[in-house]
């Protein structure tokens, strides 16, 4: 459970994108270890002062409280080391380190045949946002699982649309 709590909390730090998270995870091998690491330990393992400085924002986040917010919305998270993490995703060149889902993740991969990923810019136009949301909603209404990175912009709108469609 700890890994999930810290995986989610790290994603709440605005300057921590996938590349920085991959760098940290490669250095520490655990979300909890990243979260608990001191500034000097981060510097030693990554040789990246800017990244170590960005992680000072951890002080502003209460991991347990943030994880409870997810649970109250029925949202779960699985990490790359969990048995519930999709095996095929582990085989791609840069797999996501964690996935968010609504409902029971085991059911998603047994119940559905079709999956689509919607990704795009964080600085989307209003038209782009609306299109991503509508497309994801329509797909999920038609029993297509929409996978999104949950980043700001297109990814986030696709995620919202998929939730509206209630796959």
Each model region followed by its residue ranges:
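Short, positively charged patches
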Residues: 1-137
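Short, well-ordered coil/turn elements that cap or connect secondary structure elements
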Residues: 72, 94, 141, 162-165
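Short active-site oxyanion
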Residues: 73-76, 142-146
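Generic beta-strand structural signal
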Residues: 97, 114-116, 142, 150, ...
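Phosphate/pyrophosphate-binding betaalpha-module
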Residues: 136, 145-167
């Amino acid at each position: 459970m700890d890994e999930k709590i810290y995986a989610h909390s790290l994603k709440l730090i605005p300057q921590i994108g996938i590349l920085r998270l991959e760098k940290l995870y490669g250095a520490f091998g655990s979300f909890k270890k990243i979260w608990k690491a001191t500034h000097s330990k981060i510097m030693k393992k990554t040789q990246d002062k800017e990244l170590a400085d960005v992680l000072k924002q951890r002080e502003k986040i209460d991991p347990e409280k943030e994880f409870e917010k997810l649970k109250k919305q029925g949202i779960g998270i699985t990490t790359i080391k969990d048995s519930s993490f999709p095996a095929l995703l582990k085989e791609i060149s840069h797999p996501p380190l964690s996935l968010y889902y609504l409902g029971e993740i085991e059911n998603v991969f047994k119940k559905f045949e079709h999956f689509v990923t919607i990704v795009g810019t964080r600085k989307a136009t209003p038209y782009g946002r609306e299109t991503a949301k509508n497309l994801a909603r329509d797909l999920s209404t038609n029993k297509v699982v929409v996978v999104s990175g949950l980043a700001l912009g297109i990814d986030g709108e696709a995620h919202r649309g998929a939730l509206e469609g209630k796959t």
